[in-house]
Amino acid sequence: MKEVKRYSGVIVKCGDEVLLCKRNATGSLPGQWSIPGGSLEKDEHPMDGIEREFKEETNYTLDNDLKLVGFVKRYNRDGSEMKGLMYVFLMETDKRINPDLENAFDGDEHTECGYFDVENLPFDDKDDQLCRLITRILKKD
């Protein structure tokens, strides 16, 4: 059995919307919308990983309390083996964070970012684990 790759991601919730970023066409998950985040380094704590990844991707330092709200499992194409596990954190804020993709270290991983409410989440698969988790969080209020 292969080692499962670990990731961290953050749902940035502002009012009744969440921040999502669209992946570029050449990286992993090309053209898909997702939460900011990425791969953890060896022995890196998930909280440290999301703080690092968020800064690298958005040029913004997370300064609010983060809360672990769930996990998203990723499987190989036939669904027989888990290949990745994402620790998903939630950060609630009253002020929109506007990612600075142009000046971010890894800003080229995304082509755009935006805020979406529960009715307009840009996921092709509404049954995707991440989409369901975001929907549950947005409908809590």
Q: What name fits each language-model region?
A:
Residues 1-19, 36-39, 85:
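Conserved N-terminal beta-strand and adjoining loop/helix that marks the start
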Residues 126-141:
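Charged phosphate-binding loop/patch that engages nucleotide di/tri-phosphates or the phosphate backbone
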Residues 16, 24-25, 72, 95:
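Short, flexible active-site-adjacent loop segments at beta-strand->alpha-helix junctions, enriched
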Residues 17-56:
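Conserved Nudix-box catalytic region and its N-terminal flanking loop in Nudix hydrolases
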Residues 3-5, 13, 27-28, 81-84, ...:
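A generic fold-level signal
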Residues 40-64, 73-129:
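Unchanged
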Residues 12-13, 20, 91, 115:
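Conserved hydrophobic "DFG−1" position in protein kinase catalytic cores
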